[in-house]
Amino acid sequence: MNFNSVVFLFCFMPLALGLYYLVPGRVKNAVLLVESLLFFCWGGITWLPLAVGMVAINYAAGLLLASLPVGGKRKIVLIAAIVLTAAALVYCKYTNFLLDTLNVIASTGFAKLSFLDVLPLGISYYTFKLISYTADVYTGKVKAERSPVVFAVYVLMYPQLIIGPIVKYRDMADVLHQTQGRCTLQKAQDGAEMFVFGLAKKVILADSIAALWQDIIGTGGIGLANASLPLAWLGIIAYSLQLYFDFAGYSEMSNGLSLMMG
């Protein structure tokens, strides 16, 4: 469910924000977690157990690190949590690539894993969130989060799930624990304005520029080999600008949504 899709703009976002604003401050995190899990499941419920498992591992690792004295056991917990978390990312993103490489180099006949054709939603972003959190608890930069709901919201909140940004736990902890005054009219206005500007960058600029480079160097277009030098450069520049405005637009929409929620 992309931020610029009709389903998100006219169904999910209004309902999610409306419910979030209506509930008391003490249950906002629980509501946001449910909304984030629904958003995640829209991209593929198959991967929900993996995401929940990764969150649980690092939540438990944080509590263990907080309870253990300085010494080798803490380092073992840190390494185990990081290895398990990173292994999930590597498995999902690179297993089929490695199988293809082996088939080419060693003439093996390994079949690709079809269920890995669609990656878990946001796995790169929440993997690095989890690793940064556990490392910060280990080094004493942050205290271990005791609330599983607050921790899960930090990792899986839907505004940051698709394209980040990767925000450190210490930069969000105070807001996530704030039960009164989190949402204000000014934040809602500023966030909505930021979201609209990001949406414009994505829909008006990025998508329009994408159509240009597709006509020149994309599949079904003129083709880079057949294009003149100026036209080829135009296609390359258009592709670069499309990537920039696509990422900038999504990032701005993400930040706008987060600001609207406090």
Regions found by a protein language model. Name each.
Residues 1-262:
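Membrane-embedded transmembrane alpha-helical bundles that form the catalytic cores
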